[in-house]
Amino acid sequence: DSTAPSPAPVSCPEHGSLDEAQAKALFARFGVPGVREIAVRSPAEAVEAARQLGPRVVLKLLSGDILHKSEVGGVAVNLTPDEIGPRLRRMAADVQRHTGRVAEAFLVQEMVAGAAEVILGVHRDPLGTAILLGMGGVVAELIRDTTLLLLPEDGAALTAWQVEAALRRLKTWPLLDGYRGRDRADVPALVDAVLAFARMAQALGDRLVEAEINPLFVRPLGQGVRAADAIAIIGAGAA
């Protein structure tokens, strides 16, 4: 509803570059759920987390200072509980070799299969603030299929109609719409997530320096969406 009231200022005690878990917690406060995950600090904790989330999991470096984890050896996928302990030790060594820093924390995440991958971000330029929306994952790297939704200057909310129209402008829209016998993606849940992300951008205003989810997993119709990776940088200032 374009006549919805402007979002109230939101207290955001964190500032600086948030780690992935903190960024997802921030996004979840506004209505964008994340994948199931557990933060760990040791191989033994990682094994226990993998047993809870398995049968196969993702292991990631957890750091607010290193945002591009894969470039320093900080991501491993498709691990079993038996594999994750040794893999964590190797990851810690790789990160230290690449960065000179000691890796102190890691995330163990559930594996999500059969989902479309979307990128969702905040884009700022002289015209104002916009929501960046497009296909994520490998598709994003290959064809850069994105569109921008400019947020209203008067603080009015985006509408579901605007978001769905933007999705339909993507060249890869058919991948969400049952292309060649694929399951139709949960587009209503994706629209809700985009609206929630926009509310966050409006509520935090200029304090939100950067925010991105890539990928946001869009599961088959009725199964919702999950943020799998997240970046957020919060500036200092009044909340």
Model-derived segments and spans:
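ATP-dependent carboxylate/acyl-activation modules
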Residues: 1-239
